[in-house]
Amino acid sequence: MTAKYGVPQQSDGVACDPSFIIVGYGKLGGLEMGYKSDLDLVFLDDAPDQLATDGEKSIDNAVFFTRVAQRIIHLLTTFTSAGQLYEVDMRLRPSGSSGLLVTSLDGFKRYQDKQAWTWEHQALMRARVITGSVRVEREFKRLRDEILSKPREADELREQVLEMRGKITEVFSTNKREEEVLKTTFGLKYDAGGIVDIEFIVQYAVLRWSQNHPELLQYSDNIRVLEVLEQLELFSAQDAEWLREAYKALRSAIHRLTLEQLPSRLSMVEVEQRGLNEYREAVIRIWTQTFKPDELC
């Protein structure tokens, strides 16, 4: 790209450094990649859009970084004799599928401050820089910490998180299936007591308490955040341990089922046989306790 177009320029005429980062969200950002996991990516740059590259075939900085992003996606989604390398999901970028492929750092901040929904801040908890400019990475981390730790009204946050969880339940859970199916099966990821409940508990805790406990912003993965919640005595040692072990057990079960090309929905008999029911019940108990209005402090 630079051989063809030159290097993007800063406002002072100095070449960028390259002022571009790739941010991983979801399982990639949370260091929890599994078999068949896709890549949730967001591309950010910090070069003036009104300026251009310094090559003979000069193009606008914004166009340059968009083409870089397109090239990266093309390489990551390459098909080989063994199948596709990865699936790439860009929907977590500002404004989702209708947004720019590459967002400026200033634009990212404005969006998160003025337009982003609470669920987008939940997603940001699992975001980390994968590669790119060290300078822009530092600025992104600063923005992430600032956004996640902004003051929030406890009851409003609780209702927004519960509302989003309810929407996920409507789409993915057995709650819309026949009553008999609901009673006799358990979806390891989306049903009550599953992985999403644990993730939402952790995300809620970060948004709720990080203003006063910046230690919660150190990590993007659920396990280490739960360890910090225990250290800060925001969660009891017993509850934090239950959630960590439940998360690991459920993720491990999904990995095995994926390798066997089986769905991540088990009969309750299988759930008992795999030793997962005690984790399911513990997660439901902690979820209920966490989201009780009178439990907020």
Language-model regions: role of each:
Residues 1-297:
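A nucleotide- and high-energy phosphate-metabolite-utilizing enzyme signature
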